[in-house]
Amino acid sequence: FSSITSYFGSTLGSIGVMIIFGAVIAAGISDTGAATSMVNFFIRLFKGKRLELAPALTGFIMSIPVFGDIAIILNAPISAILAKRKKMSMTQVAPFVNLGLTLTHGLVPPTPGILAVSVLLGADIGTVILWGLVCSVISFAVCYFVLTPIYSKCEYIEPLASYTEGIEAVEDTSSVDALLIKEENTPKAAASFLPLLLPAVMIAVGSIGK
């Protein structure tokens, strides 16, 4: 029993700061509209095509320092709005959003779960981050290209009405600006991505430095 409590105490001490840090980041994303900025960045990047990738990749990055269940809550309204805008079934959007945030939540520190496992096993955190990202990217890409044709043929599921009230479908889906989520006083994309990626980058660089 003493061994268990000893390991628990040391592990909790190691990851406690990251848990608090993740909660602060999540609150900041919610209050500033950073999630909207990130989604709009990906909409522009893909020129309005493969719209499901915008919230999916946002969740992928968001779940590196933030708990996956919180990332789901932050991404759900955005996913519903985009689905309504382009008349897409939620079966084409929700699975990939969940896939993206689940992969990094489970495989890439400093998310507390994988961070705790890494500490207990004495693994190099920088190496875990590197291989976690490699595995996550490959897994997401394979699943996306394999499952997209399947989900596109599934039963049409409407986005949740409470998220899409007042949202109209876009007639000209080739117009990128028409697909963007309009929200005032949102931070720039770079400022939105920075607090999510910086912890992992700093930990990885610190590990390489050792």
Cite the ranges covered by each PLM segment:
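Transmembrane alpha-helical segments and their short flanking loops
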Residues: 110-130, 134, 155, 160-163
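Long, contiguous bundles of hydrophobic transmembrane helices that form the permeation core
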Residues: 133-210
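Membrane-interfacial helix-loop connectors
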Residues: 73-89, 114-128
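Alpha-helical transmembrane segments and their lipid-water interface positions
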Residues: 17-21, 72-73, 108, 112-113, ...
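Membrane-embedded alpha-helical segments and adjacent helix-loop junctions characteristic
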Residues: 1-85
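Membrane-interface elements of multi-pass transporters and channels
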Residues: 28-36, 45, 49, 86, ...
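Interfacial loop-to-helix junctions that mark the boundaries of transmembrane helices
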Residues: 4-13, 122-134, 185-191, 210
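Alpha-helical transmembrane segments of multi-pass membrane proteins
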Residues: 49-64, 87-106, 110, 127-133, ...
